[in-house]
Amino acid sequence: MDVLVLIGRILFALLFLGSAVGHFTQTDAMAGYSASKGVPAAKASVLFSGAMLAVGGLSVLLGIWADLGSLILLVFVLPAAALMHAFWKESDPQAKQGEMVHFNKNVALGGASLMLFAFFAHTPELGLTITGPLFHLG
C-alpha cells in the first residue's frame, strides 16, 4: 500500500510542479493572461501562485507535512477555477468549452486535494513520508 500511495502522490504532484515551472519560466506571458482575467497585481500573483504550486507540490511529493501541502494546493485551485476559468463569462462556444474543462479540472483537483488532506491528517500510516502530519483529524 505504501508504494501505491507514493506512486499516486508522485502522479498528483507532477501536475502542480510542472505548472510551477511554467509560472516561473513564462511569468510575463502568464501575467498578461492573468491581467486579461482581471487579476490584480498580475505579475506578483503569478509568482506567488507559482510558489504555492511549488511548495504544495513538493510537500505532497516528499511527504513533508503533506497535509499542509494539500491545503495549499486546495487554496490555489479553487480560486483559480473561479477567477481564471469563468466559463460562464465566455460568449464563444469553443472558448466556453475550453474554460469549462479547465474549471472542472480545477474543481476535481480541489476535491482530490481535500481528500489527501483528510488522509494525511487522519492517519500517520500512509508511509514513505519524511514527516508526519501537521494537523490531526482523528
Predicted features and spans:
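Extended, low-polarity transmembrane helix blocks
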Residues: 1-29, 36, 40-51, 55, ...
